[in-house]
């Protein structure tokens, strides 16, 4: 997921994407615990995507305060 794509999304879309990624991370952790996870690097990528989303949401929040 590219940051430029995320910056073009609305806050509602970003929050929906964040919710989807959090549920995906939960499922990946569950699969890891049960030994069914095929690609453990996916957990790292999802965590980084969540961090990117939160960063952009915070940037948008600060833009609104300053405006």
From Swiss-Prot:
What processes in GO biological process is this protein linked to?
A: translation
Coiled coil segments of this chain: none
Q: Cellular component terms, GO, for this chain's entry?
A: cytosolic large ribosomal subunit
In terms of superkingdom, the source organism counts as Bacteria
Q: What are the alphabetically sorted keywords of the record?
A: Ribonucleoprotein, Ribosomal protein
A GO term, aspect molecular function: structural constituent of ribosome
What family, per the record? Belongs to the universal ribosomal protein uL29 family.
Record's NCBIfam families?
L29
PANTHER family for this protein: 60S RIBOSOMAL PROTEIN L35/50S RIBOSOMAL PROTEIN L29, LARGE RIBOSOMAL SUBUNIT PROTEIN UL29C
Q: Identify this protein by name.
A: Large ribosomal subunit protein uL29
């Amino acid at each position: 997921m590219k940051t430029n794509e995320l910056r073009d999304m609305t806050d509602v879309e970003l929050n929906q994407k964040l919710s989807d990624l959090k549920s995906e991370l939960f499922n990946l952790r569950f699969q890891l615990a049960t030994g069914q996870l095929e690609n453990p690097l996916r957990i790292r990528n999802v965590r980084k995507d969540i961090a990117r989303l939160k960063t952009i949401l915070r940037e948008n929040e600060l833009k609104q305060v300053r405006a």
